[in-house]
Amino acid sequence: MMTTSDDFNSRRVLFHSSNNSRSSSRNERKSLTLRANAASASKGEVSLLDYGAGNVRSVRNAMQKLGYTVKDIKSPEDILAAKKLVFPGVGAYGSAMDILRERKLIEPLREYVLDGTKPFMGVCLGLQLLFDGSEESGGVEGLGLIPGTVTKFTGDDLIVPHIGWNVNEVKRESYLIDLQKDDPSSASVSERVYFVHSYRALPNENNKDWVLSTCDYGSEPFISAVQKGNVMATQFHPEKSGFTGLKIFDQFLSGGKSEMETSSALPSSASSDAVRKGLAKRVIACLDVRSNDAGDLVVTKGDSYDVREKSEGESGDVRNLGKPVELAKKYFDMGADEVSFLNITGYRDTPLKDAPMIDVLKLSSETVFVPLTVGGGIRDFTDSNGKHYSSLEVASAYFASGADKVSIGSDAVEVAEKFYANNEQGDGTSSIETISNRYGSQAVVISIDPRRKYETDPKNTKNKCIETKRKLGPNGEKYCWFQCTIKGGREGRDIGAYELAIAMEKLGAGEILLNCIDEDGQGNGFDHELVKMVADAVKIPVIASSGAGHPRHFSEVFGAVPACSAALAAGIFHRDEVTVKECKEDMAKSGLPTRL
């Protein structure tokens, strides 16, 4: 028998009191411990090698949250003088090596690691750069400290980038990585941590002494962490791996003496390998942000993109559902796998002068240690003084403020139109191309805002049509395509979501955020037909959005469209109608790989 929304909501209070209290208490204890660390005297100094690419702010915030003083590397001499050195690599391999070479940091970095007497930790690209080289960027030499070449993931059915929460198979004893403690059969399996990368290093006979852990994704396990004495590096991002990641940083910085507790008992429904292991399906909390009529930045939510209150048919104030920074922290504590900020009036604002949005990112990154995405206004623009800014400059400002990914909406539609007009070729100047070339494809999310466009005959449009079984047209039409819109859904264009997604993947985007204007705020579940059509068209991750009204809607879209990597909701979380935990419990009961 199907559970109604009223039945579900009537049981929520009991569910929360019995099932959420322990989780809330654990998170409160962790937060109290972190606040105490940050407030106490410094535990010591750690040097940070920030070469100016991507979001390094979160690494800095994590170490400061743990009670350490962070010193920036400003010269080659600073590397050799460092007591502890953290090297968070972000972006493309070639760009990173070019910057290190220009700043004359390659040789001192090699000397520091080869010496091995002082602690070193590389993160993500900071691990890859330790190898001989990479096939990325047309083939580039690395630091040559670990034997092997970094190569791209392969496999016809593999979704690349590898984005999300996965487990490590730990090969030998180390204080760096915690294991799952609640299942004896998982004695060598770590808690889930956050990965985002398209290239990986493979274990071989020449580097086996370095390999601390591997991760399964694709045709063969790749190296997820290395350690030799005081030298350590991870392919995953500890600073984006919640309390588990903070514990890893604390273990590194304290030499294995961390007292943080991160493991929690998983429910019996999560005991199967299918739930515990493998790349987890992600639950993303989205905050639609805009200024209200008083000029305050608020989180809002609408129906079919209309965010104003209604009173006797008239438009009222912007619907206010809370403060962005507070809600982001709330969702992190609840277990959201990512948090997304969408500035829904960004298409008409001047992004680099949007100080409140920049401040939201900076403040959120101090307390939210999962990936942050920001969207709205990522485009080239000229301000009122005639000064021109590129989309790359806009994205760079967001990355420097704490964002891990940028979401591009209206500009992507116009870029795709030019792409098809130019015989399916990019010109190298678009926002998608310039940002992905600098920061990597994983940093670029394409937000598609389509609505159903019905046709009596699929031949009436150049765009891909489907025969719909979900909802017929107003005159009984059984064919439809999904028309892309710009300007917050106000203007439709003659290009479909299918065509847009294909163009964006070819131009270098790393992820698709697939909204649906027809289902926005309706609570009827995600549009499986739309999600399947786009997920089948590309080999990059697809995020389902718009329509969630019940925890089962998340399980249903993942079951109906196995290629769907994540699902996103906003209003149901803001109004406390559904919690992130409830969605994940339902996913685990359905046997889906879930981070709990």
Predicted region positions:
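Cysteine-nucleophile active-site neighborhood
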Residues: 84, 90-166
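N-terminal chloroplast transit peptides
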Residues: 1-22
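Active-site beta->alpha loop and helix N-cap motifs at the rims of alpha/beta catalytic domains
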Residues: 332, 336-338, 342-412
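Glycine-rich phosphate-binding active-site loops on the catalytic face of alpha/beta enzymes
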Residues: 343-346, 392-424, 516-521, 544-582
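Hydrophobic faces of well-ordered beta-strands that scaffold small-molecule active sites
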Residues: 234, 281-289, 339-341, 372-376, ...
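Catalytic cores of alpha/beta
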Residues: 368-402, 454, 529-566
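Conserved N-terminal beta1-alpha1 strand-loop-helix module at the mouth
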Residues: 266-367, 423-430, 434, 438-446, ...
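Amide-donor transfer/coupling interface in amidating biosynthetic enzymes
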Residues: 33, 37-42, 79, 112-115, ...
